[in-house]
Amino acid sequence: METEMKILIGLSGGVDSAVAAYLLKKQGYEVTGTTMSIWDNFLPAPKTKVNDSCLGPENENIETAHKIADFLTIPLYVTDCSGEYKKVVLENFRNEYKEGRTPNPCIRCNAYIKFGILPAAVKKTGLSFDKFATGHYANIGFDSSTNMYKLYKAADLNKDQTYFLYRLTQKTLSETIFPLGIYTKEQVRNIAKKIGLPSAEKPDSQDFYCGDYNDILQFPANPGNIVDKNGRVLGKHNGIWNYTIGKRKGLGLLGGTKDPLYVINISAKQNMVTIGTKEDLYSSSLTAKKVSWCSILPPKKTIEATAKIRRQHKPEKAFIIPQEDSSVKVEFAQPQMSVTAGQSIVFYKDDTVLGGGVII
């Protein structure tokens, strides 16, 4: 083993990245930490605990990261990525909601900020390192038969984070280490407690932002109609960005209805929200664009795989059909509920992440 290899690890102040840093140091690597700063008080502070989300006041997290670095006796650099984060992640977040889509900012952040701008910014300071590591639950391997790096699911399938990592490139995979991929969350917690890490009891973050999304969107009211499938007006909305596919509560309907109703379509062009029954939420196919193949070359013909249309979605059998414009059509073996434009669909073959794209 190359004990002199230099590893830069992203330290969030949480237990996962702290244990990852500990494991790397224990294996003999020269470890340096970096903490990404993305908060510059451009929004009112969310009224919740700091560690409930990624985006929010981060003084406590940075302080904890320093304590972790001191505990592990490794250097720590705080890297300001707030400008890039606003431009790359938050502007896209606002634009997508304005168009009636529901984005996943964590996927975009991973692809462009955490695994791109963050390590690149540290390199610009003159610090040299061989690999970049994080506390994500995922695995990376090299397939000599295809001469390609592969992204694999984590051992702990309940904590597996590959859904958020499908946009990592071959170059990024070749430069990345995921020390926690072979561990369960319980094992990670136990390691943290056993060695007395400062973040051992810290709860997991729950979302990218724990306040009202309108804090970020800041759109003026734009009233429009809520209609049924036949175009009959059932109510009014103040902005399509307040709705997502599958939403049931707080729809703003004028009167009671016999059956539960759900949002089944959002049209930015018509400034209209369409509602229907639960049965109307099911789709047997979808189209995805901005497709990224992380572990294989772009397929030229139909492939069979399993697909997830959201983080908590159980992978379902599907056929991925490449299109001439580099998008893909996905046909499911069984209809799927709440296919949502703006969310990502991720393709798997057993434990291998093939790639994914953005649902349109």
From Swiss-Prot:
Gene Ontology cellular component list: cytoplasm
Task: Spell out the Pfam families in the cross-references.
Answer: tRNA_Me_trans, tRNA_Me_trans_C, tRNA_Me_trans_M
Q: Where in the cell is it found?
A: Cytoplasm
Chain spans, region Interaction with tRNA: 159-161
Q: What residues does the record give for site: Interaction with tRNA?
A: H136, Q343
Q: List the disulfide bonds.
A: C109-C210
Q: Which residues bind ATP?
A: G10, L11, S12, G13, G14, V15, D16, S17, M36, G135
Q: Which GO terms describe its biological process?
A: tRNA wobble position uridine thiolation
- GO terms assigned for molecular function: ATP binding; tRNA binding; tRNA-uridine 2-sulfurtransferase activity
Catalytic activity reads: S-sulfanyl-L-cysteinyl-[protein] + uridine(34) in tRNA + AH2 + ATP = 2-thiouridine(34) in tRNA + L-cysteinyl-[protein] + A + AMP + diphosphate + H(+)
EC number(s) recorded for this UniProt protein: 2.8.1.13
Keywords (A to Z) from UniProt: ATP-binding, Cytoplasm, Disulfide bond, Nucleotide-binding, RNA-binding, Transferase, tRNA processing, tRNA-binding
The family database entries (CDD domains) matched by this protein are listed as: MnmA_TRMU-like (cd01998)
Among InterPro entries, the record links this protein to:
MnmA-like, MnmA-like_C, MnmA-like_central, MnmA-like_central_sf, Rossmann-like_a/b/a_fold
Q: What residues form the catalytic site here?
A: C109, C210
Stretches that traverse the bilayer:
none
Purpose of the protein: Catalyzes the 2-thiolation of uridine at the wobble position (U34) of tRNA, leading to the formation of s(2)U34.
Please name the NCBIfam families in this protein's record: PRK00143.1, trmU
Family membership noted in the UniProt record? Belongs to the MnmA/TRMU family.
| Protein name per UniProt | tRNA-specific 2-thiouridylase MnmA
Name the source organism: Endomicrobium trichonymphae
